[in-house]
Amino acid sequence: FLPFIAGMAANFLPKIFCAISKKC
């Protein structure tokens, strides 16, 4: 369960950071 959540976070966090910081 935790590796799945870690994978989701690793997938979503860069996209969220990209959208917020406008650094892609």
UniProtKB/Swiss-Prot annotation:
GO CC, alphabetical: extracellular region
Pfam assignment, any one: Antimicrobial_1
Predominant subcellular localization, coarse grouping: secreted
Residues in the signal sequence: none
UniProt keyword annotations, A-Z: Amphibian defense peptide, Antibiotic, Antimicrobial, Disulfide bond, Secreted
Tissue and organ distribution: Expressed by the skin glands.
Annotated GO biological process: defense response to bacterium
Compartments where found: Secreted
Organism domain of life: Eukaryota
Function: Antibacterial activity against Gram-positive bacterium S.aureus and Gram-negative bacterium E.coli.
Protein family (similarity comment): Belongs to the frog skin active peptide (FSAP) family. Brevinin subfamily.
Protein name: Brevinin-1Bf
Organism from which the protein derives: Lithobates berlandieri (Rio Grande leopard frog)
Native organism taxonomy: Eukaryota, Metazoa, Chordata, Craniata, Vertebrata
